[in-house]
Structures are given as C-alpha cells and as structure tokens.
C-alpha cells in the first residue's frame, strides 16, 4: 500500500508565478488507485516530465479556485488523463467558479475538455465524494474567489489536508483537526499578513488551536517575500511543537503506518 505526495513546485502569487523563482506546478497525491494532480499552475506538465512522473497515469484533477497560479495547466492534465482526448476517463473536481464559472470568474477548463472526463463534480465546503480508494471532503476558504475550496483527503494511512489559498478563519480549525499531514499555503513570513492568504503566524495560530495537531506541516505556495523558507519552517516548528518543512520542486513525502518519511527526487 502506498500514499505519497510529490511537489512540482512551492511558489504562489503573481510575482512568484511570473518570475518562476519558485516553481508553480502544484502537487500530486498517489495511492494504490489514485493519481491526482492538485492545482496545476504554470509549468506543471514541464515539471512532471522533468521529474519523470508519467502524466498519462493521472486519473483525477482537483482545482481549488480561479486564479492562474492554480489552474493554467489544467486542460493539459485533462488531455493526459484522457489519453490525448481519445478515451472518456478520469475525474475532475473543483469549486463552482472553476467548473461552471460565476460572475466575473469564468470556468477554467473548457467544456470540450470537461466532456471527455468520466465525472465532473462541483464541490462546496462540507461536500464529500468517494475518489477511488480515498474520500475527499471540501474545506472552507476566505479568498478573492468566493467559491474557493481546500480539501481533506482520507487515505488508508490517515488524512491529508490542503488549505488552498485562504486567510485564517475559525472553520479551518475543525476542517483540519486531526489530519496527519497538513499542506498549508503560506505566502509570507512571520506576521506579514495580506488579505486572502496565510502568513506564518496564522499557521501557528491554526495549529495551536487544534485538539490534535498534525504530525507534519508542509509550507506551500510561498511568495517572493518568503526569502528563507527553511528559517521560517524552524520558526513555525518552534512555536507549534511539530515538524515543519518547506515544499520544493521534487519533494516526495510518503505517509506510512504510524510514521512518514520524505526525500528529494530529481
């Protein structure tokens, strides 16, 4: 049995995306049955091939909200899922804005591409869906896209949480209490808070408010002003008592029975 997370970058926000000083390819979650790509921003398909991860084996796509650092390679991932649009295959999960569009937010995967998938589903916070050998539950956010979602994925070896882009709101405490691994989109360091996003101090408050803290926090979606992620990870760890590591291109985290391990793949 396997449960693993592989990062195709760690950057987020307009400046990090434009400069590509931190890659913005999102991340993958692989289990025995699931091969899910989460938030494939610019360069996702390039990073997959660089790391020699087969895009063709992908069978699920999750896009959290309608900002380009999360969705731009989505249609290419769909083309991989569907074997070059030749087979009706795979699952696409996303927020209302992502899948159907709403107001100024247009859907980000074309109806043509959506038509080639076996299942397309809109998720709202609190919604759950069976996803191969896992269960996914959408979580709350407060961000520019009012329909944005994160998720909590239940696997054979415990739960993985993903905040997506959000500022600190009380609902996050319940959403992620008890997950084994939490992937938190932390754009800025210390108390340098900006609207719609978490800073390091927000992550500390979130972790310390939980009844059962995660075993591991992974810092993701870091902006250009997050100049020394390792020092920031140590700061968060010192103030929460849990292990904290920054994501980076090629980081692979394996969730095992009663433990976890991580390494860098190239």
From Swiss-Prot:
Q: Which domain of life is it from?
A: Archaea
Q: Which Pfam families match?
A: Lactamase_B_2
Q: Which CDD domains match?
A: metallo-hydrolase-like_MBL-fold
According to the record, the signal peptide region is none
**What name goes with this protein?**
Uncharacterized protein MJ1374
**Species annotation:** Methanocaldococcus jannaschii (strain ATCC 43067 / DSM 2661 / JAL-1 / JCM 10045 / NBRC 100440) (Methanococcus jannaschii)
């Amino acid at each position: 049995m396997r449960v693993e997370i592989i990062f195709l970058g760690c950057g987020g926000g307009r400046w990090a995306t434009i400069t590509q000083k931190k890659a913005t390819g999102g991340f993958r979650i692989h289990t025995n049955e699931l091969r899910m790509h989460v938030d494939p921003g610019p360069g996702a398909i390039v990073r997959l091939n660089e790391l020699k991860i087969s895009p063709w084996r992908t069978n699920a796509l999750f896009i959290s909200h309608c900002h380009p650092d999360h969705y731009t390679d989505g249609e290419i991932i769909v083309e991989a899922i569907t074997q070059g649009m030749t087979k009706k295959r795979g699952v696409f999960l996303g927020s209302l804005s992502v899948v159907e569009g709403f107001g100024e937010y247009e859907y980000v995967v074309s109806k043509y591409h959506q038509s080639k998938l076996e299942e397309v589903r809109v998720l709202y916070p609190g919604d759950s869906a069976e996803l191969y050998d896992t269960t996914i539950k959408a979580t709350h956010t407060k961000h520019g896209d009012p329909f944005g979602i994160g998720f909590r994925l239940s696997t054979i070896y415990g739960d993985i949480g993903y905040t997506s882009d959000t500022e600190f709101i009380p609902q996050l405490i319940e959403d992620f209490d008890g997950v084994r691994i939490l992937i938190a989109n932390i754009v800025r360091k210390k108390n340098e808070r900006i609207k719609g996003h978490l800073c390091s101090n927000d992550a500390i408050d979130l972790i310390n408010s939980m009844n059962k803290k995660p075993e591991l926090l992974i810092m993701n979606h870091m902006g250009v002003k997050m100049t020394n992620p390792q020092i920031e990870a140590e700061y968060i760890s010192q103030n929460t008592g849990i292990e904290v590591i920054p994501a980076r291109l090629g980081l692979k985290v394996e969730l095992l029975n009663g433990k976890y391990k991580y390494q860098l793949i190239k």
